[in-house]
């Protein structure tokens, strides 16, 4: 949630900043509701002043032995008016809060202005795409030919946008997870966490998925009595890991906190009809190793650069060519104030595709979660950051395509061989 103070003054600058994100701020609504809030606030304070003045008068009358019945009756009436005004103010404030939850984060000053991914800015490239002397196959063809990637079985078990991995391909999938977690914990000092794959609505509200993006989530239903449950499958480990500090007051000496976790992720992929229907790129269920940092405002910019570098290091160790882009205002996620996407080279598509997204959310999520840091007598909102380190299925398909051989086999990257019993190829 953005700072509510920004919605109480001149809205022109805020409207212009949000417009770069494709969000139209309803200035008439916010000006009207703010005037209503001010009026109720003044009314409440005036009534409270009358009550306080009346209490003093009652004391003075009692001291002089005079009759207080009329004044007490008036004060009782005032107390009733105060309760009504306070109730109205609370109801109005709840309306304001619910409306504010729909507003995206404000872009950082150095985020390029743009409408779509076409306006993202390339920051750097690493590695040179391999030159093949045979016909390039896509990962779906490679996996199916090996008999280790089975979309038909997944469709029978569940439906479209699911997969079944078998044999050495399933082993490589597991090896990637172990390699990523070892890198983040041993090399970069993250605390590995095991978190629930089911969270409540407060957790999703804290990180920004609710209330605006409920259609992207899988919600659980109690079929015993057909009642809705306050439970959802996680769309990313960012949700449970970030919410570990929800409602907490942290000591500044504790920060930054660095968490990592491997989890499945579940997404409805609403709005993705017809896109990436073949293969592993866009699935309802996929695995990801996630990084989360909880930091001070002074630490967060530097930590975003570090986190992005940590995700890049995984690709470098796998010798997978990639590029890093800074997202423009119109392509950033709802909660982010600045984001880098890392895109890996896919030979079959002759292009780079997203494999990681690393974001600094500033105090946007912290304000929703009520998470603060204490520095002496002063407290302030923490900053939260998250990043994929990496999306496992997309890393697997990138390895399959970049390490494919003419005979249909896949060479296993050297860093993964210790996790695969020393094997050097998938046949």
UniProtKB/Swiss-Prot annotation:
Q: What class of enzyme is it?
A: ligase
Q: Where in the cell is it found?
A: Cytoplasm
Name the source's superkingdom: Bacteria
Key words of the record = Aminoacyl-tRNA synthetase, ATP-binding, Cytoplasm, Ligase, Nucleotide-binding, Protein biosynthesis
Positions binding ATP in this chain are: 267-269, 354-357
List positions binding L-serine: 236-238, 290, 388
Which cellular component terms (GO) are annotated to the entry?
cytoplasm
Q: Share an example GO biological-process annotation for this protein.
A: seryl-tRNA aminoacylation
Q: Which PROSITE patterns match?
A: AA_TRNA_LIGASE_II
Provide the E.C. number(s) assigned to this enzyme: 6.1.1.11
Pfam families in the record: Seryl_tRNA_N, tRNA-synt_2b
* Pathway the protein acts in: Aminoacyl-tRNA biosynthesis; selenocysteinyl-tRNA(Sec) biosynthesis; L-seryl-tRNA(Sec) from L-serine and tRNA(Sec): step 1/1
List the GO molecular function terms. ATP binding; serine-tRNA ligase activity
Task: Spell out the InterPro entries in the cross-references.
Answer: aa-tRNA-synt_IIb (IPR002314), aa-tRNA-synth_II (IPR006195), aa-tRNA-synth_II/BPL/LPL (IPR045864), Ser-tRNA-ligase_type_1 (IPR002317), Ser-tRNA-synth_1_N (IPR015866), SerRS_1_N_sf (IPR042103), SerRS_core (IPR033729), tRNA-bd_arm (IPR010978)
What job does the chain carry out?
Catalyzes the attachment of serine to tRNA(Ser). Is also able to aminoacylate tRNA(Sec) with serine, to form the misacylated tRNA L-seryl-tRNA(Sec), which will be further converted into selenocysteinyl-tRNA(Sec).
Task: Provide the family line.
Answer: Belongs to the class-II aminoacyl-tRNA synthetase family. Type-1 seryl-tRNA synthetase subfamily.
Matching PANTHER family, A to Z?
A: SERINE--TRNA LIGASE, SERYL-TRNA SYNTHETASE
Q: What is known of its domains?
A: Consists of two distinct domains, a catalytic core and a N-terminal extension that is involved in tRNA binding.
Q: How does it assemble?
A: Homodimer. The tRNA molecule binds across the dimer.
- Please report the name of this protein according to its UniProt entry: Serine--tRNA ligase
Q: What's the source species for this entry?
A: Psychrobacter arcticus (strain DSM 17307 / VKM B-2377 / 273-4)
- Its gene? serS
